[in-house]
């Protein structure tokens, strides 16, 4: 790729950001712009005094309540009004008061006594798992099927030999898969972890009320399914350790077979871990591995039948971006199938949020820079432990969401009307290519609804499981506490990229903390803001530079501008992204609507007003564009509905104000008369076809027009929100630019490598506005999105995905429209 391509070459630059309009110095604001030392959240200053006072005196929010819409009966179970007030507890702080003994010797031996008094014994765990799995009907059928394929025309004797051969193979697989839990090993590991965690973590906080709900769930004699977010390898041990400390039996943990290494694998098996393949789909010859799938299914069914607890990581692998990744629902589908066969009466689902000040891996810069992932080995584990002992990784927070009934969730979904099945291509192409007649709004609506009514049971089942997985991950992500490193990294990258005085950073930190609490997210820290900020800066290490200035004897804090440091700061900054993600989407959509009019787009709206309906639809389309970046909203809500609610919050904050009646007179056509030139299909509306015709929605509605506040603090907040999505949108727009030079079919791994090299080169030559836009995660997500919306066709050649342009995007003009669409949201 030559340098001209890096500067966007011959592409129509009238739609591209002008570098002269961007100054990193815009990220730097004085303390006066954030307000005086009253530290009220800036966007709420226009609210009433009473509302502001209640905000400042608010208690910590209690996170993790289940969805009332999908599980109304579970909402009242395991919860009572006193639970939120039970407060936090540091799990690794143990002394003689946590044992039945007192005195000098008890103080010296408190760890040993505490571990010895935990309730763990052999009778808690599954027995005869291997034999029961091998004798299950599904496994027997799979063995017979595989044996028949090995010896299709053989005699009965040869067939018997083939069956025995397959059975031996099945036993070998189960030896790797089936865990043999050892109570003695759990106790020993508990004592070791108590020592280790105290050496490299300041504390591990849990909410006592949440643990009370989990304990109440264990008394139902139903299997529990723990579904945590996945940030670090420590996640595997952390949950088991916490449950052990509270006399709750250890769950069986699904682990990737990359951790099946000598000695370490034995430890994992003894603690309840069982290894599964990272890819279940195919055998080396390209066919489905019927035997392995049957064994895995039988193993999960047997554990649930014996009322064991399971722990599954829905993301499949550790998040390399700091955001909660999209769900991979393979194992979850096995759990749902088990319930549908009436083997067990019900399963209780418990999403789990885990937050670290600093993960023990430190960062994933190597993989984000495109280097291949190193395979785990005993030596790498030993080096990791030694490295951990040399450092302190700050605080950890684990949040257990309210348990909910899987049976109730499935029944509630079956009673809901089947909504339109919209693919990303159906949702976004009308916005990207509005002139395509086949994608007209009305036609898209009818087609999608007919497809949903004619959908097979299997497609509906897959959709149900995918929605369940998204529901769980959204709740787990919402439960994740915001850590001090998350806020400091976010402020340094997206408010003070050129540096800031420590005193101002502390003020802004306090403001951001209040903003987080106001959105019902909890914090993973407490104490004096200055101390907490210094703690975070210390943990961020070489990513932050501290210099002493002569002015007022002040310290000046600057984020490092090297690519690895920016990647690392972005990883921790993404820990706070989900707090503001919907507001950031509205802020970027606000820019898109206003910028379109500034470029002379067709509009009947006065220059100082914007259409709320147009803003909401524009934001809904951006939600679809970013849907590969994680779960943006609950699947029981449409993007249209969530965007509509977020615009309402902007009105509540005072960022947007509703135009006076006189201003709206004669300019607000009914919704039926409006023709958006980039209108999304009607199924994006949150109104159901089954709405009561007597309701207000049965009447003709008139659009609402809004004004944008011009106050400095509101404009600064909008800018901050827009910058949060800056790296994502720059990565997607750069990928769209790269598509202009696409030539011929190319293997997907090769294309990913070329695109990533292009983004890294832009960063190294200071062409990129956001260096963090070049992370490999964003490259993969952008290409996946382009496949989903129909830019690329994907074919398989020798088990390798090959990409080529679809007929829709063969014309250069359509690729240009894709680029223009993404750039319409980009603020520089």
UniProtKB/Swiss-Prot annotation:
Q: What is the effect of changing residue 273 to L?
A: Abolishes catalytic activity
User: Which residues are annotated with the PTM Phosphoserine?
Assistant: 380, 688, 695
GO MF annotation: an example: glycerol-3-phosphate O-acyltransferase activity
Q: Which residues lie within the membrane without crossing it?
A: 88-118
Q: Which residues carry this modification: N6-acetyllysine?
A: 780, 784
Result when mutating residue 318 to A: Abolishes catalytic activity
Impact upon substituting residue 313 to A: Abolishes catalytic activity
Name the pathway: Phospholipid metabolism; CDP-diacylglycerol biosynthesis; CDP-diacylglycerol from sn-glycerol 3-phosphate: step 1/3
Similarity-based family: Belongs to the GPAT/DAPAT family.
> What EC number(s) are associated with this protein in UniProt?
2.3.1.15
Q: What is this protein called?
A: Glycerol-3-phosphate acyltransferase 1, mitochondrial
Task: Name the residue ranges with Basic and acidic residues bias.
Answer: 442-455
UniProt keywords, alphabetically: Acetylation, Acyltransferase, Lipid biosynthesis, Lipid metabolism, Membrane, Mitochondrion, Mitochondrion outer membrane, Phospholipid biosynthesis, Phospholipid metabolism, Phosphoprotein, Transferase
Q: Where in the cell is it found?
A: Mitochondrion outer membrane
Looking at the Swiss-Prot or TrEMBL record, what is one Pfam family this protein matches? Acyltransferase
What result is annotated for mutating residue 89 to E?
Abrogates mitochondrial localization
**Annotated catalysed reactions:** sn-glycerol 3-phosphate + an acyl-CoA = a 1-acyl-sn-glycero-3-phosphate + CoA; (9Z,12Z)-octadecadienoyl-CoA + sn-glycerol 3-phosphate = 1-(9Z,12Z)-octadecadienoyl-sn-glycero-3-phosphate + CoA; sn-glycerol 3-phosphate + (9Z)-octadecenoyl-CoA = 1-(9Z-octadecenoyl)-sn-glycero-3-phosphate + CoA; sn-glycerol 3-phosphate + octadecanoyl-CoA = 1-octadecanoyl-sn-glycero-3-phosphate + CoA
């Amino acid at each position: 790729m030559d340098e001209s391509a890096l500067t966007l070459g011959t592409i129509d630059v009238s739609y591209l950001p002008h570098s002269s309009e961007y100054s990193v110095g815009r990220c730097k604001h004085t303390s006066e712009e954030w307000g005086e030392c009253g530290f009220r959240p800036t966007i709420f200053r226009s609210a009433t005094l009473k509302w502001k006072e209640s905000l400042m005196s608010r208690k910590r929010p209690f996170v993790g309540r289940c969805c009332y819409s999908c599980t109304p009966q579970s909402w009242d179970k395991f919860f009572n009004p006193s639970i939120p007030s039970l407060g936090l507890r540091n799990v690794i702080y143990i002394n003689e008061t946590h044992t039945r003994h007192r005195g000098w010797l008890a103080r010296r031996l408190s760890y040993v006594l505490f571990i010895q008094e935990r309730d763990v014994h052999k009778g808690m765990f599954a027995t005869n798992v291997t034999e029961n799995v091998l004798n299950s009907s599904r496994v027997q059928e799979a063995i017979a099927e595989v044996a028949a394929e090995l010896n299709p025309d053989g005699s009965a004797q040869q067939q018997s030999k083939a069956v025995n051969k397959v059975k031996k193979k099945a036993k070998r697989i189960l030896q790797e898969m089936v865990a043999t839990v050892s109570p003695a090993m759990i106790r020993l590991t508990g004592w070791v972890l108590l020592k280790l965690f105290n050496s490299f973590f300041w504390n591990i906080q849990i909410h006592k009320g949440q643990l009370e709900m989990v304990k109440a769930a264990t008394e139902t004699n139903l299997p529990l399914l723990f579904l945590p977010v996945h940030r670090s390898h420590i996640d595997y041990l952390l949950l088991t350790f916490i449950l052990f400390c509270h006399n709750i039996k250890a769950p069986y943990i699904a682990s990737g077979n990359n951790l099946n290494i000598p000695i370490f694998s034995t430890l994992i098996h003894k603690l309840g871990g069982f290894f599964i393949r990272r890819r279940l789909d195919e055998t080396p010859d390209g066919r489905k591995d019927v035997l392995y799938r049957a064994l895995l299914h039988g193993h999960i069914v047997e554990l649930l039948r014996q009322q064991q607890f399971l722990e599954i990581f829905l993301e499949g692998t550790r998040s390399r971006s700091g955001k909660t990744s999209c769900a991979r629902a393979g194992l979850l589908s096995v759990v749902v199938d088990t319930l549908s066969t009436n083997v067990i009466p019900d399963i209780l689902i418990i999403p789990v949020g885990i937050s670290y000040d600093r993960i023990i891996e430190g960062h994933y810069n190597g993989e984000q820079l495109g280097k291949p992932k190193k395979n785990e080995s005993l030596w790498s584990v030993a080096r990791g432990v030694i490295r951990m002992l040399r450092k302190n990784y700050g605080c950890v927070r684990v949040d257990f969401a309210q348990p909910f009934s899987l049976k109730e969730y499935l029944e509630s979904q079956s009673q809901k009307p089947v909504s339109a099945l919209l693919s990303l291509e159906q949702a976004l192409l009308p916005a990207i290519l509005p002139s395509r007649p086949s994608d007209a709004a009305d036609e898209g609506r009818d087609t999608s609804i007919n497809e949903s009514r004619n959908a097979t049971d299997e497609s509906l089942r897959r959709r149900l499981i995918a929605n369940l997985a998204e529901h769980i991950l959204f709740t787990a992500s919402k439960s994740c506490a915001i850590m001090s490193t998350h806020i400091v990294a976010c402020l340094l990258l997206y408010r003070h990229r050129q540096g800031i005085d420590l005193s101002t950073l502390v003020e802004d930190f306090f403001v951001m903390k209040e903003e987080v609490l106001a959105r019902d997210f909890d914090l993973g820290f407490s104490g004096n803001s200055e101390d907490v900020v210094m703690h975070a800066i210390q943990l961020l290490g070489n990513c932050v530079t501290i210099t002493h200035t002569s002015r007022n004897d002040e310290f000046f804090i600057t984020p490092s501008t090297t690519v690895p440091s920016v990647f690392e700061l972005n990883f921790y900054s993404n820990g706070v992204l989900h707090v503001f993600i919907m507001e950031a989407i509205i802020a970027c959509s606000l820019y898109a609507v206003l910028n379109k009019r500034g470029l002379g787009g067709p509009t009947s709206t006065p220059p100082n007003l914007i259409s709320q309906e147009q803003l909401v639809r524009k934001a809904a389309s951006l939600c679809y564009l970013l849907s590969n970046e994680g779960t943006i909203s609950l699947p029981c809500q449409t993007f249209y509905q969530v965007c509509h609610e977020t615009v309402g919050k902007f009105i509540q904050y005072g960022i947007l104000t509703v135009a006076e009646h006189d201003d709206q007179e004669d300019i607000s056509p009914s919704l039926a008369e409006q023709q958006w030139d980039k209108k999304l299909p009607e199924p994006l509306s949150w109104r159901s076809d089954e709405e009561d015709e007597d309701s207000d929605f049965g009447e003709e509605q008139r659009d609402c027009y809004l004004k944008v506040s011009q106050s400095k603090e509101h404009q600064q907040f909008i800018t901050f929100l827009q910058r949060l999505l800056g790296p994502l949108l720059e990565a997607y727009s750069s990928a769209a630019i790269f598509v202009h030079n696409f030539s011929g079919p190319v293997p997907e791994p090769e294309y990913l490598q070329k695109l990533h090299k292009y983004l890294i080169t832009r960063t190294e030559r200071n062409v990129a506005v956001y260096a963090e836009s070049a992370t490999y995660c964003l490259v993969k997500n952008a290409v996946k999105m382009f496949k989903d919306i129909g830019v690329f066709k994907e074919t398989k050649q020798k088990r390798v995905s090959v990409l080529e342009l679809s007929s829709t995007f063969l014309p250069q003009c359509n690729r240009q429209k894709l680029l223009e669409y993404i750039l319409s949201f980009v603020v520089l």
